[in-house]
Amino acid sequence: MASTGSQASDIDKIFGFFNDGEPPTKKPRKLLPSLKTKKPRELVLVIGTGISAAVAPQVPALKSWKGLIQALLDAAIDFDLLEDEESKKFQKCLHEDKNLVHVAHDLIQKLSPRTSNVRSTFFKDCLYEVFDDLESKMEDSGKQLLQSVLHLMENGALVLTTNFDNLLELYAADQGKQLESLDLTDEKKVLEWAQEKRKLSVLHIHGVYTNPSGIVLHPAGYQNVLRNTEVMREIQKLYENKSFLFLGCGWTVDDTTFQALFLEAVKHKSDLEHFMLVRRGDVDEFKKLRENMLDKGIKVISYGNDYADLPEYFKRLTCEISTRGRSGMAREGQLNGSSAAHGEIRGCST
């Protein structure tokens, strides 16, 4: 019993400031054995809009593509960058749920002068307006999610995101840790990320708002990467050899950018094992998603019935995975006569 108390104490040290000491009110969802036995360095975390929406729920632009385009449109109108007829046209397209990628592309083109000087684009101003002061809009439960992601990163997991925001990087900076934001415009860095030489970097496959020139909405926007056989080979090896863990993603695997990067070369492989954490929600929808994803080698796992269940579930999962990862590194360190593993163990409980 003493060892159990010690383990709980270590977990509290990592995640303690979110623990109010109250006993759980309902039985937590069990962790899937095939996932909880993974080591951090065997994982690639895929961060979707659901995570950003949970971290800063008061920012509509983080909740969906439609919310982002509406926020950009509102900013453009506030800055008097569109004529009345133009703004009405964009509002109509959004209301009618026209192809959102095309709507976003047209809006960006409208806000960007025909020049190679990215600094002169109004699109950049609108982006900064939409994502202004994100640090002050993070909620504690969302910070717990980011803390878990950061902890897995520090223990060897890779991270990529479909989001334009830099919430994870901002949270890490607040903790005194530096993360680098990457996008697909820098082939050299993307290659190094895929080769696990830039583990404390976050790959934004659609770009990040702090670098407007790197934002891409369609595969045509990153042909430089698609044509680079060395980069593509390393990227696709990740999907073949590691387990991707989708967080707040839903239908991310239908995203054309994600498909072009990771799925095209592995369509017919049957030995893939990836995971997707989702809310149980509607039973029929959950069943449909699970069946659809199994065909793609992705196990859909319910973390609970409510969105509020995710932070606690992911915290438990992170602790389980990190503990196994550290014990494995300790064994490797002993075999190699290395002291580095000891540092990893101490680092987990700080």
UniProtKB/Swiss-Prot annotation:
Phosphoserine modified-residue sites: S9
Keyword set, alphabetical order: Acetylation, Nucleus, Phosphoprotein
Location of this chain's protein in the cell: Nucleus, Cajal body
Annotated segments matching region Disordered: 330-350
GO cellular component: Cajal body
Transmembrane segments: none
Main location: nucleus
N-acetylalanine: residues carrying this PTM: A2
Recorded GO MF terms: identical protein binding
InterPro entries according to UniProt: FAM118
Family annotation (PANTHER family): PROTEIN FAM118B (PTHR28623:SF1)
Family to which the UniProt record says this protein belongs: Belongs to the FAM118 family.
Function text: May play a role in Cajal bodies formation.
Name of this chain's protein: Protein FAM118B
Gene: Fam118b
